[in-house]
Amino acid sequence: MKRLFLIALIILLAAMGGILIIQRTQVDTDVTAQTTKVGIFTNGEFMDRSWGQTHYEALESLKEELNLEIIYKEHAPGDCYADIKELIEKKGCRIIIGCSFDYGKAMQKAAAEYPHTYFLHAGGVYHQENYSSFFGRMYQARYLSGIVAGKKTKTGELGFIAAFPNSQVIRGINAFTLGVKSVRPDAVVHVSYCKSWTDDAPALNSCLKLLDNFPIDVVAVHTNSMAPHQEADSRGVWSVGYHRDNRDLFPNTYLVACVWDWQIYYREQILNCLQGKFHGRQDWIDKEKGMVSLSPSPHLDMDTAILVREASEKFNSRGFDVFYGPIKDNQGQLRINAGESMSDDEMLNGFDWYVEGVTVED
C-alpha cells in the first residue's frame, strides 16, 4: 500500500511541476548595491497560513539576494491611497505591491501621481506604464483539484465557500466544477458567498449553511480563512485548500490544495524595476512557469494521480484548456460552442455566469 502511495505521489509531483528545479539567477550586483525599499500591503495578515503568507514567504526569500528592505502593512482598507502615500513619501518605498483585488482604484490613482514609483497589483485588472497587474492561471489548478475531489466524493454533492462573486472567484468555481464533472458527471457543487476575503465568522457561517443542509462530503474554498477547513475536519469531511499547502494542520481530511509561488515573478519584476526595464502590463502566468500548482497529497489513489497528470500534460502542451466548448451554464444555455474557447479577456473580466452543476445557495 505504501509503495502504491509513493508511486501516486511521484506521478502527482511530476504532473504539477513539483519536481524541484533550483533556478539560480545571475543578479546584477550594481543594481542591488544599494538597498531598495519595497512596501507591500494586504487586507488581512501576512502570517495567515494563506494568501498573505505566500507573498511574505516569496519576498523574504529574495530579501538578501536583491538587497531589499520590506515594509509590511496589514489590514489595509480597499481605499488604501493614504497608506500608499505614506509608504512612498514617509517610508521611501520605490516599489509598491498590493495584495487584494479591492486596491485597484487607489493604486491607479497613486501610480498616476507617482510616475517614478513602480506598482505591482496581485489579482488586479488595470495596468499603465509604471503599474502591472498579475495573477496566475489558477483556474487550471482548480480544474485539477476538481478531478481529485470528484474522484473522492461518495455523495456527488460538494460545497464551495467563496468570498465575493467577481470574475476571478466565479472562474475558479467554474473550473473546479468542470474538473469534478469530468470524472463525476452527475455531481452538484453548492456555493455559498461569505462576503469577506479574510474573516473567520462569515466563512464558518457559509460552511455551516452548506454542511447542515446538504450531504456534502468535500468542500473547497476561495477565502483566506481556515475556519471552513476546521469545521470540515471536525465532521470528517474532505477539504480542498487554496493559496498555501496546510495539510500539516488537517492531516486526515485535507485532500489537496491549489497553491501559489510568487518568488520567480517577484524576482523578475523587481530586477526589471532596478534595471529600468519595467513596463506595466497585465500578466497572466501559465501553470508550467511555476506560479500555480497542486500540492502533494497522501490521499490520492493511483487512478486519480494518473488522471491529474494527463490533464496537466494537456495544459502544458496547449492542446486543452478548461474553458473549451461545448460548455453550458447552469440555466441550460450554451455559453461556449464546440471547437471554441474563451479568450483571456473573457476569462479575466467576463465571468458573471456559472457552469452546469453549480447551485448558488445564498
What function would you assign to each model-found segment?
Residues 7-20:
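Hydrophobic membrane-insertion alpha-helices, especially the h-region
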